[in-house]
C-alpha cells in the first residue's frame, strides 16, 4: 500500500487530496476528512477530487488474496464500506468504493488493471505499466516473506520492501 500511496501522492494534481492508512498519511483517526464525513472507518486509500462540484470521493481498499479468493475479497471490501459510501453520498458528495486485489502470487486481473487505470488517470500517474509491475512484485515478495516467516515465534520489524 505504501508504494501505491506514494505513487499517487507524487503525481496527483493540486486539487486532489490523497490519504492512506499509513503513519503520517491520515487525518485524525481516519483516512476520510471530517468535512466529508465524521467516521472512524479507515479505508486503505481515500481520494478526494475537488475539481468537480460536488467533490468526488473514492475509497480504495487493497487486498492480497489467493487467486481463488479474488472475487470473495472484492465482495467483502465493497460490503465493508457500503454504509460509509452511502453516508458520504447522503452528505452531498459523489462517492465510489474501488476494491483492488493483487493476488499473493503477483497476478493482477483485467478488472483490477482497469480499476487501477481509472485511479491512475484521476491522479495523473504516467508510468502505468511500471507501477503495475511494481505492485505485482511487491505482492509476490511480501507473500514470500510471510511464507518464510511461517514458523517464526515472533515478527520483527522489517524494512519496507522496495519494488
Per-region residue spans from a language model:
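Active-site metal-binding core of divalent-cation-utilizing nuclease and nuclease-like domains
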Residues: 1-59
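Amphipathic alpha-helical protein-protein interaction segments
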Residues: 35-38, 53, 67-74, 121, ...
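Short beta-strand-loop-alpha-helix junction that forms the active-site gateway
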Residues: 42-45, 56, 61-76, 102-104
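Residues that form ligand- and interface-recognition hot spots within folded domains
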Residues: 49-51, 62-66, 85, 101-106, ...
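Short helix-terminating capping/connector loops at secondary-structure junctions
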Residues: 53-55, 90-96
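Aromatic/acidic cage segments in peptide-binding pockets
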Residues: 74-82, 116-122
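Metal-dependent nuclease catalytic cores in nucleic-acid-processing enzymes
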Residues: 78-92
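Domain-level recognition of nuclease-like catalytic cores that cleave nucleotide substrates
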Residues: 95-163
Amino acid at each position: 500500500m505504501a508504494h501505491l500511496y506514494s505513487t499517487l501522492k507524487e503525481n496527483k494534481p493540486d486539487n486532489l487530496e490523497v490519504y492512506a492508512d499509513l503513519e503520517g498519511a491520515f487525518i485524525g483517526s481516519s483516512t476520510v476528512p471530517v468535512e466529508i464525513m465524521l467516521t472512524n472507518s479507515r479505508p486503505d486509500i481515500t481520494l478526494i477530487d475537488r475539481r468537480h462540484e460536488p467533490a468526488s470521493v473514492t475509497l480504495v481498499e487493497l487486498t492480497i488474496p489467493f487467486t481463488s479468493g479474488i472475487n470473495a475479497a472484492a465482495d467483502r471490501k465493497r460490503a465493508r464500506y457500503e454504509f460509509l459510501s452511502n453516508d458520504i453520498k447522503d452528505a452531498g458528495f459523489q462517492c465510489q468504493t474501488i476494491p483492488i486485489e493483487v493476488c499473493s502470487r503477483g497476478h493482477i486481473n483485467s478488472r483490477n488493471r482497469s480499476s487501477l487505470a481509472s485511479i491512475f488517470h484521476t491522479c495523473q500517474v504516467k508510468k502505468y505499466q511500471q507501477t503495475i509491475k511494481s505492485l505485482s512484485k511487491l505482492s509476490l515478495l511480501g507473500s514470500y516473506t510471510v511464507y518464510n516467516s511461517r514458523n517464526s515465534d515472533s515478527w520483527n520489524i522489517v524494512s519496507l520492501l522496495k519494488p
